[in-house]
Swiss-Prot record:
Potential cofactor involved in sensory organ development. Despite its interaction with the Polycomb group protein Asx, it does not regulate the expression of homeotic genes. GO terms for cellular component: chromosome; cytoplasm; nucleus. This is Protein tantalus. Ubiquitously expressed in precellularized embryos. Then it decreases at cellular blastoderm to increase again during germ band extension. During germ band extension, it is highly expressed in somatic and visceral mesoderm. Ubiquitously expressed in imaginal disks. In ovary, it is expressed from stage 10. Binds to DNA in vitro. Interacts directly with Asx. Residues 20-35 have a biased composition (Polar residues). The modification Phosphoserine is found at S204, S264. Pfam families: Tantalus. It comes from Drosophila melanogaster (Fruit fly). It is found in: Nucleus; Cytoplasm; Chromosome. Residues 16-100 are annotated as: Disordered.
Amino acid sequence: MDNIVYDFAKITFQAKDNRSPTTNSNLSWQLNQMALSDMEEMQDTSEPIAPPESDDNVSSESHDSDDVDSQLSRCEDNDDDSDCISGSSRRSSTFGARAGVARRRMPARVSKDNFNRICSAIMKPIKKKQRKELNTNAQTLKSIEKIYTSRRMKKFTPTNLETIFEEPSDENAADAEDDSEECSISSQVKVVKVWGRKLRRAISFSDGLNKNKILSKRRRQKVKKTFGKRFALKKISMTEFHDRLNKSFDSAMLEGDDAEAGGSAEAVNIPKTSMTMEDIQLPTMSSQHQFLMQPAGFE
């Protein structure tokens, strides 16, 4: 413990010299130049004018020259030390900043003012304006009609076009209804096979811009007529319902008697009586149940 305290007592804290190494080298170079100029002036002033040379003068001149050489050598030593210190500090600073990576500074490139250079950027195509009006010509209509009526065009996918092949026939065209509004441009009535059934189909070509409410209503009515058939219910009175039941029973019993007589010729003849609804007593209905919902096709 005493040794540690003794070692701490030896430590002396001194402020570091933050001056740059370049300033120190410049100051030392200026001091050397000043010392050399002072020595030259002193030599010029101390020289006598044409005295006779003697041993004392030679000895004094040699002594002065020795002094100057010693001073110059000291200055050179000081310069070398300062250069070494500045170089070591510079290396340490660069090593700490770049972490041991040595990089070479390249000179800046000269800018080339070439205004006729072609731009290398990829130019975007100009957006096409959407057409608000549909251009309908006779040629375009014929091409559309050819696509729908030709059987040779097989390159179209089912999502783009219908997969029904249609064949024109004059007989179906004569029996078709004439709808001038729906078939304003061109129409053809075809016989189409769909799920094993032959259906009549009219194809119309229009520009797609002119839409009429009457035309849409007619199309909806046609769709309901073909695909939306239902049994229509009709109200009838109870007496009419009883009469229809009696007729149906009588016809059924007579058909049964004829079948038995023709089928068994050797059978024993048994007296048969025809039974009617008058013999059957139906319960009396109240006034609230006078009418009943019955299908119109029941006869």
